[in-house]
Amino acid sequence: METGPSEEPSGRKESQEMCPPGLLVFAGSSEQDANLAKQFWISASMYPPSESQLVLRRDSSQRLPVARPRRSRGSENSHSSQSFHLASNKNRDIFAEALKIQESEEKVKYLQKAKTREEILQLLRKQREERISKELISLPYKPKAKEHKAKKVVSESDKEDQEEVKTLD
């Protein structure tokens, strides 16, 4: 964007019209630089575009016209409402059927999981029974653990204490 000497006066008028004096100060700059800077700041500011400024005229209205309901024959209107009800009933039937199918699939899935669980529990019971039977078979051949029956050594003072407690009762 170049401004020459012929454009300077018009540019100055535009900047003075668009921007009141005193708001923008460019001290120590040439007049051409000041005008360019003013034009930049004016264009960079967030003023709403002129298209968005609503101006109400006598011949213009800002509201869209309201749609009027069509008047049709009574038989056509009842026929369309019947077809709508039939379509909605069909949709309900389709949704109900889809829901039943989904529920039956879930039921089959859960029954399969229950069957798998029972098989696992049965296998664990079988393994436990086998382990117990093997332990019973090998029980006579296992070395007997020595039982440490340590004799209690009761000191005389403990005996005396016990006797005193008995006499108090």
Swiss-Prot record:
**A family per Pfam:** HOATZ-like
GO CC terms on record? cilium; cytoplasm
Instruction: Kindly list the residue ranges recorded as spanning the membrane.
Output: none
In residue numbers, the region (Disordered) covers 1-21, 52-89, 144-169
> Record's superkingdom?
Eukaryota
What does UniProt give as the signal peptide span? none
Q: Which GO terms describe its biological process?
A: axoneme assembly; cilium assembly; flagellated sperm motility; spermatogenesis
Q: What is its main location?
A: cytoplasm
Q: List the disulfide bonds.
A: none
Q: Where is the composition biased (Polar residues)?
A: 75-89
Which ranges form a coiled coil?
Answer: none
Which keywords are on file for this protein?
Cell projection, Cytoplasm
- Can you say where in the cell this protein is located? Cytoplasm; Cell projection, Cilium
Which family would the database say this protein is a member of? Belongs to the HOATZ family.
Summary of the function given for this chain in its UniProt record = Required for motile ciliogenesis and flagellar genesis by mediating the maturation of the glycolytic enzyme ENO4.
Any idea what this protein is called? Cilia- and flagella-associated protein HOATZ
* Organism, as annotated: Homo sapiens (Human)
State the gene name recorded for this protein.
Answer: HOATZ
